[in-house]
Every structure is written in structure tokens, then in C-alpha cells.
Regions:
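Conserved, mostly hydrophobic/aromatic
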Residues: 28, 77, 135, 179, ...
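Substrate-binding/active-site clefts of carbohydrate-active enzymes
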Residues: 138-158, 162-327, 337, 344-356, ...
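Active-site-proximal helices and loops of the catalytic beta/alpha 8
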Residues: 47-59, 213, 325, 336-434, ...
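Loop/helix patches that line or flank the sugar-binding groove of alpha-linked glycan CAZymes
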Residues: 436-617
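Beta-strand-rich binding/interaction modules
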Residues: 28, 34-44, 606-624
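Structural beta-strand segments of beta-rich domains
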Residues: 22-26
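The feature marks proteins involved in alpha-glucan
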Residues: 1-21, 46, 56-153
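C-terminal beta-strand-rich structural cap/linker in extracellular carbohydrate-active enzymes
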Residues: 30, 71-75, 631-652
Length: 652
């Protein structure tokens, strides 16, 4: 049987560890191997263990059964192709690892699951109603200003009586969180400028990957965020598998507050520097290779996972279902989704919706030179809308590439194009999406400059390579706040779900901290902080108080959006546009149970005058404040100040 036939024959096999009443069965798909053994270890740091020969089936799956009374705590595989390197199970649900860029690891045989979910289930929130906070779990609590007793951990994230973590989500009214990767990843990278190594690292003096887009194990939670997680070199971590239940406890606590949990997942490539199981076993099967057998890297991350192969697709789907069933995850954001073949995209949609019809599927619709938000929409996915992002703020302040909030129309577009973006960028109007709920609008993500730094550079507050301190830039000027508020009003009155990045609500700066002493860019504004587990990324909650005026505005806008469904998702037939006296202004009239009128003026120099539909209108938001209780009333004519907006309501 050929390898291509083997994977089809093996697709229904349950891989990894399976429990029967009296025994545990171990299975590994490795059709190219001549010999595979299961290795059982009593201790996590044992260099050798008990080897049990595995039987190779005709479909390329190796299998062995072990009676319950013969089980140990840890296991791995020894395969002919990996030499002396033992290989953890690629389906590991928990691992113990030694902190080193190669990450020697063993799989943990967890006790039978008895976690008490206390009646918790996935949330039933509709994607179009979401206000998503994109956040790094550690960044949200590790700074001393958070007041957390267990900083940087799953447990710390949901502590009561703190300023960060779950308290911040509740304070702002966010109803979803999108965590940067929580699957076990290679957070220690190759030594800096070590000539004894085969790879010369002259780009990462931090020797780290902070964000997590280097997945090592697709079924296991990240150890570093557990109560036993440390990053000290040479130390073994995760011996007890504590991260498993601690992550479940975090999800349960978030659900109790009505907050949906979305995981950022990476299936387009795997970890680069550690001994990844998929690289040690079945490299030729699981990766896209060139003619010389070397890894292709259109992802830009050292390798490209071959999602189109049957067993690759099986792993991706079973990984997603594992997080849904075992961790009650409500949705996923897919990194570089354009690199996932559409047959796999379709299979993901079918499999996840069979478990949860309301599953949230969001693609980052680019990668490897591709760009496919329209195709993802046709397969039922939502996508980040970079057209909205660029049209509102611009693309690159270093190139004087500005958008609406700076009095410009990005990329030669006109206000008619801007209106299409505000009503969901629908395929029926030449856009990407079949309906507004697929349109995830945002202004900032973990990538690139924060919108705060974008505005700082655009106003020449800070040069692109200028060295500053946080104290110099943390407090926003009135000019900066004006632009921030217009951006926030644009975002939070757009159709479909919206995403807000951590720290966005106070215009945070990413000033490169000099934590390693060898970063030549220390003190500059950072546009790619993937490697920095320091104050470059950590949220300083004092800055939230420092810029409370902008924070209050965001909080008020979120409350208005949550209260009035017309703002979030109304049929196209119930949205009409009106023009203001300025060419850089327009209004959106949305009708449902209530009539909502949003007026926007991007003009930097002129007030825009709007003739209002008949009746008395209550002001919900103006240039300074946003409040569901109202800020007075207006009729006939509205004057919208430069670089500002209004939200008006007329109850039916």
C-alpha cells in the first residue's frame, strides 16, 4: 500500500493515547518508519526507559497496548528515522519539557479527566454581536501594576480584585477575548550570536518567542502560563500537567461572566527550533518541501505545514475538536489562513459546526503571498478586514500613508468606498463578505505599530527611529485624543464584529525596553514585538488611569454598541447614507427597533453640517463623551466638529 493510500486507510484511527477499561492504547501514524517503540519513563528526567515494540499496521499506523498496572507517568516514541532523539507524541495532551531551544520533551499520561465544569457550556453569543479584545495572556497581568497575586498565569488572569485580566474585560464591557496562542509553543529560541551552533542568530538578542506563533504541540496548553511555568534555562517544567486544569478553570471563569473565549491557532507551520514531533517523524508527509527535500517557508516561519494531506487535515480538525470538547473553547482565529487549503477550510467548518453551530471561525486572510477573505467567506468563515483598518487610519506612518481620521482617503478611494466598508464590505457591493457578521473590523492587532504609536508618528510626536522613554509618550495630548476618539467611533459603529487590541483603549505605546542590554533599538517604538517578554509588551495599568478620558469614551461606545443591535448588524435595506457639507463627511442611518444615526467628519479643518431626518434625536456620543443615558437632544441640523462624530438615536 502506498503512503497516499495509507493515509486514507488510517483516517479513522484514533491516534495518540486512548483509554480502554483495562489498558491504554498508543497509536502513531508513521508509514515511512521501519521500527517504532513506545518508551515508558518513571521520571520526567530519565534518559532511558522501558521500550515496548509497536506493531505496524497496513495503514501505516503503529500500535501497542499497555495494561493499566504497567503504566508509568511519562512516555515518548523511539523511531528509526529520529536516531537517538526520543519523540513525544504529536497528539500529547500535556508535556513536560526542559527549557532549551531544542526542548527535550516527554508526553504525560494524565489521570482520567474528572474536571468539574460546574454546568459550564460554550457561550451562545452570535459572532455579529461580539466586541473582541485581542490579548496576550501574560501581558495582561504580569506587570506589577495589575495587582495580580499570580501574574502571567491562567489563574492570575481570572483573579478578582485586580486591574488587569478579567477585571479589565468586565470594566470595558467586552464580551469576547481572543487569546494569542495558548497551545504549547517554543518560547525559548536559539542562542544569540553563538558560533558553536549551526544557526547563527544575529536578529533576536532576547532568545525568545513571546507571542506564541511557533506551535510545538497542538493538543496541549502552554506550560509557561501554568502555576509551575518558568523560563529559566535548563529547568524542567510542566511535570504535573497543571496547565490542563488551570486553563479549564480560566475558561470556566470567563464563561461565568458571559465572555466568549477565542483561541488564536497556528496550523500553517510548526515550531522552528525545537525537536518538533512532526519534523522527527514523517517530515516528508507533513511538510511542503522543495525538490531537494528542504522545507519551503512561504509562511516566513521556517516551514510550511502540508494542510492538504489527509492526516494533516485530520490532525487539525481533531485538535480543534479537542479544544472545543475538553476546554469549551467558543471559537478560533486562524493565523495566515490563506495557507490552509480550502478543502481543509471546508472540513473545519463542517466538523466544528457539527459540535457547536455557533462556532466562531475567523481567518487572518493572507499568508504565503495569498489573500482570500472572499473564499473564506464562501466557506462560512469571518476574516479580519484590513481594508477597513487601512481606510480608517492608513497603512504606514513611515510612508505618510494615512486614512480618514487624518483627513485623507486611503489608497485613492472615495467616500463611497468608505461607506461600503461601514456597512459590512459585502460581496453584493464588490467587497469580501456574504453578510456583515463575517466582517471583523479592527484598527490594531499584535502585528505592526499600535494605533497609539501610529498617531504619535503621524503627528511627529515621535520619529520612526527616535529614542524616547515611556514617561515621555504615555500621556496623550488633546490632539492625539481627538484622533483616537474619531477612530474609536468609526470602529464601534461599523457593521459586524469588532476587535480591539490590548491597550488600544488608552493609546498605549510600545517603547522597546532595554531588558537584555543588547537591543540596539532600545527606546524606539516597536512594530514587531514578537520576542519581548518585558515592558515593551506588558500592560502598565497606571497608563489606563493616565488616559482615562479616552478609556471612558471607549467604554461608553462599547455600551452603546451592546445596547443597540442596529449598530452591529442590520439588514442592508435598513441602512441609508446622508452627506454632510464637507466632502470628508457622511452619515449612516440605521433602522430597526430604534433609528440610529451615525455622523462622521474626517475633515481636519472644517465643521460639517448635516440636515437631520424629522424628529427629535437623543445624542448618545459626541466629540468628547459617549453615554447610553444620553447627552442632550438635537433636531433639524447637526454640526459635527472637525475630526469627530456623533451617534444619535430616535426611539420607534
Amino acid at each position: 500500500m502506498t503512503s497516499s493510500n495509507m493515509d486514507i486507510a488510517a483516517v479513522d484511527e484514533k491516534l495518540g493515547l486512548s483509554r480502554n477499561q483495562d489498558e491504554v492504547v498508543f497509536r502513531l501514524f508513521a508509514p515511512g518508519e521501519d521500527q517504532v517503540s513506545l518508551v515508558l519513563f518513571e521520571k520526567y528526567d530519565d534518559e532511558s526507559g522501558e521500550n515496548l515494540a509497536m506493531l505496524k499496521k497496513s495503514n501505516g499506523v503503529w500500535e501497542v497496548s499497555v495494561p493499566n498496572d504497567k503504566l508509568t507517568k511519562y512516555y515518548a516514541y523511539s523511531a528509526s528515522s529520529s536516531g537517538e532523539i526520543i519523540t513525544p507524541d504529536p497528539y500529547s495532551q500535556a508535556v513536560v519539557r526542559q527549557n532549551h531551544f531544542k526542548y527535550p520533551s516527554k508526553s504525560i499520561i494524565l489521570p482520567k479527566d474528572n474536571f468539574d465544569w460546574q454546568g459550564d457550556e460554550v457561550t451562545s453569543a452570535a459572532i455579529g454581536d461580539l466586541v473582541i479584545l485581542e490579548a496576550h495572556l501574560r501581558d495582561m497581568t504580569v506587570h506589577s501594576s495589575s495587582g495580580t497575586q499570580k501574574p502571567g498565569t491562567y489563574q492570575g488572569f481570572v483573579e478578582a480584585d485586580q486591574r488587569g485580566g478579567i477585571s479589565h474585560l468586565k470594566d470595558m464591557g467586552y464580551n469576547a477575548i481572543e487569546f494569542l496562542p495558548l497551545q504549547e509553543f517554543g518560547n525559548i529560541e536559539i542562542d544569540y550570536k553563538n558560533s558553536e551552533l549551526s544557526t547563527w542568530n544575529d536578529w533576536n538578542p532576547y532568545e525568545a518567542n513571546h507571542w506564541g506563533y511557533m506551535t510545538s504541540f497542538f493538543f496541549a496548553p502552554e506550560i509557561y502560563y501554568g502555576s509551575d511555568g518558568v523560563k529559566d534555562r535548563g529547568v524542567w517544567v510542566g511535570q504535573e500537567g497543571r496547565a490542563v486544569n488551570e486553563m479549564k478553570e480560566m475558561v470556566r471563569a470567563l464563561h461565568k461572566e458571559g465572555i466568549s473565549v477565542i483561541l488564536d491557532v497556528v496550523y500553517n507551520h510548526v515550531s522552528q527550533y525545537d525537536d518538533n514531533p512532526f519534523k522527527l517523524i514523517n517530515k516528508d508527509y507533513y511538510f511542503r518541501l522543495d525538490e531537494a527535500g528542504e522545507y519551503l517557508s512561504h509562511s516566513g516561519c521556517g516551514n510550511d505545514f502540508k494542510t492538504e494531506n489527509t492526516m494533516s487535515r485530520k490532525m487539525i480538525i481533531e485538535s480543534l475538536l479537542h479544544w472545543m470538547n475538553e476546554y469549551h473553547i467558543d471559537g478560533f482565529r486562524f493565523d495566515l489562513a490563506a495557507m490552509i487549503d480550502l478543502e481543509t477550510v471546508n472540513a473545519i467548518t463542517a466538523a466544528t459546526q457539527a459540535v457547536n453551530p455557533n462556532i466562531i471561525l475567523i481567518g487572518e486572510p493572507w499568508g504565503g503571498g495569498g489573500y482570500n477573505p472572499r473564499e473564506l467567506a464562501d466557506h462560512g468563515w469571518a476574516s479580519w478586514n484590513d481594508h477597513f483598518r487601512n481606510s480608517v487610519k492608513g497603512r504606514n506612518p513611515r510612508e505618510n500613508d494615512y486614512g480618514f481620521i487624518f483627513g485623507k482617503l486611503w489608497d485613492g478611494n472615495n467616500t463611497e468606498h468608505y461607506k461600503k466598508l461601514m456597512r459590512g464590505y459585502l460581496q453584493s457591493e464588490g467587497g469580501h463578505f456574504k453578510h456583515p457578521a463575517q466582517n471583523v473590523n479592527y484598527l490594531e492587532s499584535h502585528d505592526d505599530n499600535t494605533i497609539g504609536d501610529f498617531i504619535r508618528m503621524s503627528l511627529d510626536k515621535v520619529g520612526a527611529t527616535e529614542v524616547v522613554t515611556r514617561a515621555q509618550v504615555a500621556q496623550l495630548s488633546s490632539e492625539e485624543i481627538t484622533i483616537h476618539k474619531l477612530a474609536a467611533l468609526n470602529l464601534l459603529t461599523s457593521q459586524g464584529p469588532v476587535m480591539i487590541a490590548q491597550g488600544q483603549s488608552w493609546g498605549r505605546a510600545k517603547v522597546i525596553a532595554n531588558s537584555v542590554g543588547s537591543d540596539q533599538n532600545a527606546g524606539q517604538l516597536d512594530h514587531n514585538s514578537y520576542e519581548k517578554d518585558d515592558e515593551t509588551n506588558w500592560l502598565n495599568w497606571d497608563e489606563k488611569e493616565l488616559n482615562h478620558d479616552l478609556v471612558d469614551y471607549y467604554r461608553g461606545l462599547v455600551a452603546i454598541r451592546n445596547k443597540y443591535a442596529e449598530i452591529r448588524n442590520v439588514d442592508t435595506g435598513y441602512r441609508q447614507f446622508i452627506n454632510g457639507s464637507s466632502e470628508l463627511s457622511f452619515g449612516v442611518n440605521m433602522t430597526g427597533e430604534n433609528q440610529i444615526l451615525v455622523l462622521l467628519n474626517g475633515d481636519q479643518k472644517a465643521v460639517s453640517e448635516f440636515s437631520l431626518p424629522p424628529g427629535i434625536w437623543t445624542i448618545l456620543a459626541n466629540a468628547d463623551r459617549a453615554d447610553t443615558k444620553g447627552l442632550g437632544s438635537i433636531e433639524q441640523v447637526a454640526e459635527v466638529a472637525e475630526q469627530s462624530g456623533l451617534i444619535l438615536v430616535q426611539k420607534e
